Amino acid sequence: MRKAIEIKSEVVSEIVEKLQKSSAAVVVDYKGLTVEEVTELRKQMREAGVDYKVYKNTLVRRAAKEVGIEQFNDELLVGTNAIAFGYDDPVAPARILKGFMDSHPKMKLKMGIVEGAFYDESKIVEMANIPSREVLIAKLLGSLKAPVSNFAYLIDAIAKKAEGQEEA
């Protein structure tokens, strides 16, 4: 049987790797959730490409210290915590967690690191309200397309009006 120290060292290395590779890491207090609710949350996370893991707070603090994240300290990392690691979309973990919290008020956002910057709970909630990248691109394209469409309708109306005057 392997020594507990070796196992803990491997877990710390795993957390360090996830913190370095991820564009976002959001810490949440999941106290009071049932197994079914946590399973549902994990499924939503997996579908969005987000890792949702529960680690011992002491191991998270060690890993955060290795990476240089001083905010993951004794004051904030207490209780039943899980971390959602986002890789492609830095806002995805916050968005999914906030959506889940709307129907499961027992869960609480604590803090997060998004693209190297520390955010408290209120900033993470603000970030969660930002639409997804796809929605923002669609809105941008819609606003770019609108003037062209309006111009085309205007030209068409002028052409129809000119045809009406020629017939008279």
Curated annotation (Swiss-Prot):
Q: Which PROSITE patterns match?
A: RIBOSOMAL_L10 (PS01109)
**GO terms, biological process:** translation
Q: Does the keyword rRNA-binding apply?
A: yes
State the UniProt keywords alphabetically. Answer: Ribonucleoprotein, Ribosomal protein, RNA-binding, rRNA-binding
GO cellular component terms listed in the entry, alphabetical order: large ribosomal subunit
GO MF term set:
large ribosomal subunit rRNA binding; structural constituent of ribosome
Quaternary structure (record)? Part of the ribosomal stalk of the 50S ribosomal subunit. The N-terminus interacts with L11 and the large rRNA to form the base of the stalk. The C-terminus forms an elongated spine to which L12 dimers bind in a sequential fashion forming a multimeric L10(L12)X complex.
Q: Which family, according to UniProt?
A: Belongs to the universal ribosomal protein uL10 family.
The role this protein plays is: Forms part of the ribosomal stalk, playing a central role in the interaction of the ribosome with GTP-bound translation factors.
Protein's recorded name = Large ribosomal subunit protein uL10
Organism of origin: Clostridioides difficile (strain 630)
